[in-house]
Amino acid sequence: MQRNAVILAAGKGTRMKSNKYKVLHKVAGKSMVEHVLTNVKNAGVNQIVTIVGHGAEDVKETLGNQSLYSYQEEQLGTAHAVKMANEHLKEVEGTTLVVCGDTPLITAHTLQKLIEHHESTHAQATVLSATAQIPFGYGRIVRDEQRRLQRIVEEKDASEAQKALTEISSGIFAFDNRVLFSKLEEVKNDNAQGEYYLPDVISLILAENGVAEVYHTDDFNEIMGVNDRVMLSNAEKALQQRINIEHMRNGVTIIDPTTTFIGPDVKIGMDTIIEPGVRINGETVIGEEAVIGQYSEINNSHIGSQVDIKQSVINDSIVGDKTKVGPFAQLRPGSNLGSDVKVGNFVEVKKADLKDGAKVSHLSYIGDAEIGERTNIGCGSITVNYDGVNKFKTVVGKDAFIGCNTNLVAPVTVGDGVLIAAGSTITDNVPNESLALARARQITKEGYLKK
């Protein structure tokens, strides 16, 4: 059966008090609408239409070709928003899911269960509900004496008795697609807000003795909407807790989950230890038995097994097995460290390959370079890669020893087994098994200060 989805992402989000479009605010490193779209796709939906309004181009840039788009010029209510998808879905068969773009905690599992319940009961509409301790602001689920859905009433239209109900509508629905777009034509705006409410489609279905169902989730957090910065913070905490718990149950030790921030797409191997204050984002993959030291930050990188990282920043890089990084090192984009490499304190690496066993232990900059196996780069050594206009490459062979405070002025190639004397500035290529010394001769004038 064809499964479609409409993501509602056209609201202004004025309570966020931000120049940024509401659904583009991030939770756990990804925009809210990206979370929603990912989980909708993972629930088995074939075609997605996102309703955009304010900030439409920014949303399109974020989601790209993962979705079709319809534009809602005026925000006249949720039914009006869904109606904008007419151009893509009106003649389509199957089930259509309607999800708010500001519900980043909804899971693919719950959406899938909602769809399955809807289809198995042959319902024309199904609403996802939850029980709220404080239901203020949510539409209430009103049931009859047989516990069947009677209607959904919005907060501002509810009686005092209805406001006392604690089962609330999530704003997430599954519909028979043809029924949905047929009934949208009949929805009126005769309510306190003067808006076209999507839940009124359910009232229209029930008025004709159609089948409307409720699927209840036990996790209220899943349907949490985000309307201001306080709610954004609450969503961040809830999602981060969920992510951390999942990693811990998969065999990862997280010393202090309350100060550890891990993105939703991160993968971490068993017996890895994450110390307090760590941030791991993007599509980072970490192997087994690694130690990620406190206050480290890793973004979109591949970290091997048994790696030890201490208080360092790693971006868009690869770190091989048994390699040590830090403390206070930085791997900038394009860094590729092999196995058993050492990048020590206050070392910066950028767009460089360090082969297996290479060591850069202290206070060095290695940029646009290739460093061979087992080569040692002495303290304070620099690859001089930039002439003010262009970047040039430095190549150092295997088993070389680069003395302290050496400048390698690119483009330059240093061969295998070379020894560079400390304090040298190397501007010419050095052949294999050579000694290179490039510094001024020391002059000592004894007794000079006594004159």
UniProtKB/Swiss-Prot annotation:
Cofactor section: Mg(2+)
Catalysis: reaction(s): alpha-D-glucosamine 1-phosphate + acetyl-CoA = N-acetyl-alpha-D-glucosamine 1-phosphate + CoA + H(+); N-acetyl-alpha-D-glucosamine 1-phosphate + UTP + H(+) = UDP-N-acetyl-alpha-D-glucosamine + diphosphate
Compartments in which it is found: Cytoplasm
CDD domains: GT2_GlmU_N_bac (cd02540), LbH_GlmU_C (cd03353)
PROSITE patterns from the UniProt entry: HEXAPEP_TRANSFERASES
Keywords, in A-Z order: Acyltransferase, Cell shape, Cell wall biogenesis/degradation, Cytoplasm, Magnesium, Metal-binding, Multifunctional enzyme, Nucleotidyltransferase, Peptidoglycan synthesis, Repeat, Transferase
CC cofactor note: Binds 1 Mg(2+) ion per subunit.
Disulphide-bonded residues: none
Region entry N-acetyltransferase, spans: 251-451
Stretches for region Linker: 230-250
Annotated residues for binding of UDP-N-acetyl-alpha-D-glucosamine: 8-11, 22, 72, 77-78, 139, 154, 227, 332, 350, 365, 376
Molecular functions per Gene Ontology: glucosamine-1-phosphate N-acetyltransferase activity; magnesium ion binding; UDP-N-acetylglucosamine diphosphorylase activity
Pfam family, one: NTP_transferase
Family: In the N-terminal section; belongs to the N-acetylglucosamine-1-phosphate uridyltransferase family.
Record text on subunit structure and interactions: Homotrimer.
Region (Pyrophosphorylase) location: 1-229
The keyword rRNA-binding is assigned to this record: no
Full protein name: Bifunctional protein GlmU
InterPro entries: Bifunctional_GlmU, GlmU-like, GlmU_C_LbH, Hexapep, Hexapep_transf_CS, NTP_transferase_dom, Nucleotide-diphossugar_trans, Trimer_LpxA-like_sf
Binding site for Mg(2+): 102, 227
Residues engaged in binding acetyl-CoA: 385-386, 422, 439
Function comment: Catalyzes the last two sequential reactions in the de novo biosynthetic pathway for UDP-N-acetylglucosamine (UDP-GlcNAc). The C-terminal domain catalyzes the transfer of acetyl group from acetyl coenzyme A to glucosamine-1-phosphate (GlcN-1-P) to produce N-acetylglucosamine-1-phosphate (GlcNAc-1-P), which is converted into UDP-GlcNAc by the transfer of uridine 5-monophosphate (from uridine 5-triphosphate), a reaction catalyzed by the N-terminal domain.
Residues the record marks as active site: 362 (proton acceptor)
Domain of life: Bacteria
